[in-house]
Amino acid sequence: MQQMVPASGYDRAITIFSPEGRLYQVEYAREAVRRGTTAVGIKCKDGVVLAVDRRITSKLIDVSSIEKIFQIDDHIVAATSGLVADARVLIDRARLEAQMNRISYGEAITVEALAKKICDIKQAYTQHGGARPFGLALLITGIDRHSARLFETDPSGALIEYKATAIGSGRPIAMEVLESKYDENMTVNEGMELALYALSKTTEELKPENIDMAIVKDSGKLVEKISVDEIEKIVKAVYKKVEAEEAEAEKNKGEEDIE
């Protein structure tokens, strides 16, 4: 875990810049995201995929009550990592913005427009006294009238569009997997397998009941939550692939030792 540099008093208010031009409260908010659950988003040729490891810490928790992927509109879905309460506030605001757009303009809001509105809210909370930044990152994705879109929002209000990305504690490992395995021509089914493969590398054991997953396909342009049974099938396929890779690596190592 990256150590935070002493702030020398410049972290006492959100509106104070350090001599290096840093806003420490924003950096602390990013630290909350780095400690959050891992979420993966992948843009495919026929849709988009979101998957989150809900990281259940107790057998007494009702898994169905832990939600990490939220439907914003018929065609937009979002995954969160960071402070749960902050997520609830921004998700409610995102849903409100989507409905206001339908009422005002008679059409669905685009993924980019919604992402920008959420980032405007996040940015406002970095420059007003008496408030703090949202300790939360969002992956906002969906299908609009243009194409599949996938955006990542930062606690500072920064907005970046990706082909595939990850947020949360497992981001570094998941990004390595995505950078090496991602293919722009992969299907949604292949994207679901890659998303779970990336998550499997960030945890000791990938349990289907702990995974939250949703897709939006070009054909229907509607958010679809993936069932636990379907996730279980994909997880089994992922672990078969992992076992095959480990066997191949062991074989190659043995051949090198012989040489």
UniProtKB/Swiss-Prot annotation:
What are the GO BP annotations of this UniProt entry?
proteasomal protein catabolic process; ubiquitin-dependent protein catabolic process
* Molecular function GO labels: threonine-type endopeptidase activity
What PROSITE patterns has UniProt attached to this entry? PROTEASOME_ALPHA_1, PROTEASOME_ALPHA_2
Q: Does the keyword Cytoplasm apply?
A: yes
Specify the superkingdom: Archaea
Kindly give the SUPFAM superfamilies that the UniProt entry links to this protein: N-terminal nucleophile aminohydrolases (Ntn hydrolases)
Gene3D superfamilies in alphabetical order? Glutamine Phosphoribosylpyrophosphate, subunit 1, domain 1
Stated regulation of activity: The formation of the proteasomal ATPase PAN-20S proteasome complex, via the docking of the C-termini of PAN into the intersubunit pockets in the alpha-rings, triggers opening of the gate for substrate entry. Interconversion between the open-gate and close-gate conformations leads to a dynamic regulation of the 20S proteasome proteolysis activity.
Localization terms from the record: Cytoplasm
Q: Which GO terms describe its cellular component?
A: cytoplasm; proteasome core complex, alpha-subunit complex
- PANTHER family attached here? PROTEASOME SUBUNIT ALPHA/BETA
Question: Which function does this protein serve?
Answer: Component of the proteasome core, a large protease complex with broad specificity involved in protein degradation.
- What is the protein name for this chain? Proteasome subunit alpha
This chain's source organism reads Methanococcus maripaludis (strain C7 / ATCC BAA-1331)
Gene responsible for this protein? psmA
